[in-house]
Structure formats: C-alpha cells, structure tokens
Amino acid sequence: MQTKEKLASLSYLAVKSLLYELNLTPKPGLVDCHNNGAHNDMDFYTFLDSILSLSPFFKKYIEVGWLYHNESPQYLFNQLRKLGIEAEAAMFSATERVNTHKGINFSFALLLGATGSYLAKHIELIQEKRRFMPQDSLTICHLAGEMSMHLIQNDLSHVETKRNLTYGEKLFLQYGLKGLRGEASQGYPSLTQKALPFFRNELLKKQDIQISQLKLLLYLMTFIEDSNIIHRGGIKSWKKVQQEAQTLLEKDLPPYQLKEQLNSYNQILTDRHLSPGGAADLLSLTLYFSFLEQLI
C-alpha cells in the first residue's frame, strides 16, 4: 500500500469512530438508532450526512500533517485551521445549518494533523513494521497540545474586553471553564489519562463491544466539562448529570439491565432537554485511538 493510500485508510478510522458513536444505542439524551434524544433539530440521518461531508477533510488533515511535519506546530495549526473552516462550512451545508460535529471537527483536525506529522517521523508505522502503542497515542495528543496551546493565551487572555462573547468565553469568565480549547491545549488529558485507560481495561473483559462503549460513555459523563449540558441546563444540571452517571456506572449492571436503565435515563435527560454531546465527542476520539492501536 502506498503512503497516500495508507494515510487515507487511517483517516477513515476517524470516520469509523463517528459512525460507531452514532450507531451506539441507547445513549441518554443523544441521537442514536432509536430516537433523537433531547434534540428536535437533528436525527440519525442528519448525523450521517454530516459525517459524509467531513470525511474528505479528515483525509486532508492527515495529509497536511504528513506534508508539513518539519514545520513548527503553530504553522501546522494554521494550515489545519484553514481546512477546518472549509470542513465546517461543508458540514453546515449538508445539515441545513444544524451544528452536528463542530467540536469534533476541531479535535479531529488537530489529532489527524498530529497523526500525519507523527507518522512522517515514524515510517515504521506506515510500513506496518510495528503496531501503534499507547505511547504513540500519547505523543500524538501531546503534539496536538503543542499545536493549540496558544489558543488559551490568544483567545481567552483578553476575553473580558470583548463585546460579543461566544458561549465558551462566557463560561470561562463566569466559572473558569476552558472547555474544548483548554482540553486541546493541554494535549487532551481527559482522553490520555482517563478515557483511553478506562476503555482499554473494559476491552480486556471480553464483553460485548457495545457494552464497553456504553460504560465508557457513562464514565465520560462523570467528569468532563460538558458545555452542551451547561449551555442547556446550567452548572447545577451538569453536576447532577455527573452524579447520576456515577451512580449508574457503580451499579455494574449486566448488559440487558444496563440498556434498560440507559433507556429510562434517556427519557429523563430528554425531558430535561439535556444532551451530553461533549461526552459523545470524547467517546469518538477514544474509539479513534482504539482503532489505531487495533484494540477493536
């Protein structure tokens, strides 16, 4: 397999991760195979259209990383940002202006770009002379952090003087929450230090892959800064969801009971109009690195 084809095949793992996340059912408050959760402006097919619109750009992200691997992280970020804006426009066109994957597009631009850059310096992985290991995933995330660390300084350092604030900027001013920019600029610690170790351990149990993913989703809901929930319900609602997810996870239910409980919890979050979209995004990123490491 030639290098360009290999890079394309690896970018498809990001597409695959989004498809796995979409197909995962039942997901409390989220769009899945059975219902639209807390969303009245999107459904399963909206997400499919969105994923298809982003797929060509995922391939470009990893190619840009490969091409500019000798450039500075800041230079690489700027190239990826240009592509990311184009990808976002394609997404909005495909979904009739519904925001399905804006956050995950940002993260995959960084992480696929970082993957391409890392592969250019580790040809043995492209040549399949060795497998991706956890240390490779960690280094890729650290590179993404180097590429985006300026975001906090540039975007949030003078935010108090801005007139028109984004919701993320308002959260930063009011609560000190740095959201996706903060997570990225630190090299995705929630992914490398929590999500991936948890999921690797779940996969060792040899249980149904969907059950492992559902447990991962619950686990992510217990700790991440989920701006989707905060935006819809405020800080108290977010904290309550964290506690409820923790309680459900600690029950360690057998598969059929877990799905029953998640179906019930889906109705609860839907009634509250709450959607843990941040957890869903981090689940997709976890799946991407799990595919790279050939864990699933």
From Swiss-Prot:
The enzyme's E.C. designation: 2.4.2.52
A Pfam family that the UniProt record links to this protein: CitG
Listed GO MF terms: ATP binding; triphosphoribosyl-dephospho-CoA synthase activity
GO BP, sorted A to Z: prosthetic group biosynthetic process
Keyword Protein transport: no
Keywords, sorted A to Z: ATP-binding, Nucleotide-binding, Transferase
Catalytic activity: 3'-dephospho-CoA + ATP = 2'-(5''-triphospho-alpha-D-ribosyl)-3'-dephospho-CoA + adenine
Highest taxon of the lineage: Bacteria
Enzyme class, broadest EC rank: transferase
Keyword Secreted: no
NCBIfam families: citrate_citG
Family: Belongs to the CitG/MdcB family.
Protein name: Probable 2-(5''-triphosphoribosyl)-3'-dephosphocoenzyme-A synthase
Gene giving rise to this polypeptide: citG
